[in-house]
Amino acid sequence: MTVTYAPRTDAPRLVAGKIRDVDVVLDLGPGISPQPYLTRCLHICVDAHRPYLERVARERAGDPRYVLLNATWDQAIGMFPDKSVDSVFALDFIEHLDKQDGLRMLREAERVARQQIVVFTPHGFFPQSYDDPGKPDRWGMDGGYWQTHRSGWAPDDFGDDWDIVVCHDCIELDQNNQPMARPVGALWALRTLSPPTPRRHQVVKDPSVWAHVKGLLEQGLPPPVFRRLQSVWGGVLRRIGRA
C-alpha cells in the first residue's frame, strides 16, 4: 500500500493524475453529482434514489454518454459480467453502506472492473444522519435515508494493493451545507488492476477527413515514422500551394 498525504489545495490534482482515461465507467451511488474526472466515456450511473437520477437527466440534457440505472448498487452490479467495464467509481458512497456491505462492494468492483477502482470517502467515521423522514437532504430533496452515514473508512481497510491519498482538511461543510468549525479529513483509494491500455475509440475533435486520418496514423505508427510522414506531406502541400 502507498499512502500519500496532501493538503486540500493539492489533493484533487494529485488524484486526477492517477486516474486512467478509459472508455466505460460504472459510477455507483453518484447522487446528483456523477464522477467529474472522465468526460469522454460511456458513463453508467447507478443510484437507488430515482429523483437524483431524474435531476442528472435534466441537467445533462439527454447526453447520450450517460446511462442511468435506478437500482441499489448490489442489484445493478450483480448483472455485470466479470471484467465488463473499464473502471468503477464510488465517490462519497461507501460510507453510506455498513462495513460488511462496503467490503462486499469493493470485491464486486474488483470483479467487474478491467482497469481501475476509484473510491472517495471521509477519513474515519463522519457522523451524518437523517432521523426525521421529513427532513430534506443537503440538496433540498427527499433522499435523507440514502445520505445517512453507516461506516467509517481508513487506509488499512483497503489492503496492500491500493494507492491511498489522504487529505486532512478536505471536507469543510456539514450535512446542511454549513461551514464546520474544523474541516474533516477524507481519502481517495485507487486500485489499479491491469497495465495501461490505449483508449479503444479515437475521438475526432477536427471534423476534417485529414485530421481524422492523421489522428489514426499518429496513434498507430512509431513516432519517428509519423514525424517523417508528416514532414513529407507538409512538403507536398507547400509545393502545390495548399500549406
Predicted regions, residues:
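S-adenosyl-L-methionine-dependent methyltransferase catalytic module, highlighting the catalytic core
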Residues: 4, 75, 98-242
